[in-house]
Amino acid sequence: MTTNTIAQIQASIKSIPDYPKPGILFRDVTSLLEDAQAYQATIQLLVDKYKDMGFTKVVGTEARGFLFGAPLALQLGVGFVPVRKPGKLPRNTIAQSYELEYGVDTLEIHTDAIVEGDKVLVVDDLLATGGTIEATTKLIRQLGGVVEHAAFVINLPEIGGDKRLEGLGLNVYSICEFEGH
């Protein structure tokens, strides 16, 4: 993919000031989804990057990680595993809590979704603090999966999530970077 393709993807992401609260510049990935060419280019970029790496599963985090992880898994010919908030998955699950700016949240994964030795790619729309992906990585590893890569459409490097995830041994890839919070 060319620099023009990445520029097209980045340009398709709208920035919404003071959402969800004053002082935040929200990066709205749903505007990318509305642009079929940008959405397709995003998935193709991820396919091109990860197609020969031997992944057996793609894990996407609730909810926007599903929008990029599921089509990527299909293109890679591997299964897709959702990581969700508590009470949303019907089979047996394990849970991992993580800290938010003002509180704690929890994620769950089906206990039979990852088998020992699965090589897993984690996908989400945006990397900020890295808390969601840290919790997701812990869940995958608890089930015996091998996770060394995390892919994002957007990274906000000033927040430091990429460094946090690298500290967990993850190779972090993002298509676009934006300044700010």
From Swiss-Prot:
Gene Ontology BP annotations: adenine salvage; AMP salvage; purine ribonucleoside salvage
GO molecular-function terms, A-Z: adenine binding; adenine phosphoribosyltransferase activity; AMP binding
Functional pathway: Purine metabolism; AMP biosynthesis via salvage pathway; AMP from adenine: step 1/1
GO CC annotations on file: cytoplasm
Principal location class: cytoplasm
Pfam families per the UniProt record, alphabetical: Pribosyltran
Broad EC category: transferase
Location relative to the cell: Cytoplasm
Catalytic activity reported: AMP + diphosphate = 5-phospho-alpha-D-ribose 1-diphosphate + adenine
Role this protein plays: Catalyzes a salvage reaction resulting in the formation of AMP, that is energically less costly than de novo synthesis.
Family: Belongs to the purine/pyrimidine phosphoribosyltransferase family.
HAMAP family: Aden_phosphoribosyltr
Protein name (record): Adenine phosphoribosyltransferase
Lineage of the species this protein comes from: Bacteria, Pseudomonadati, Pseudomonadota, Gammaproteobacteria, Vibrionales
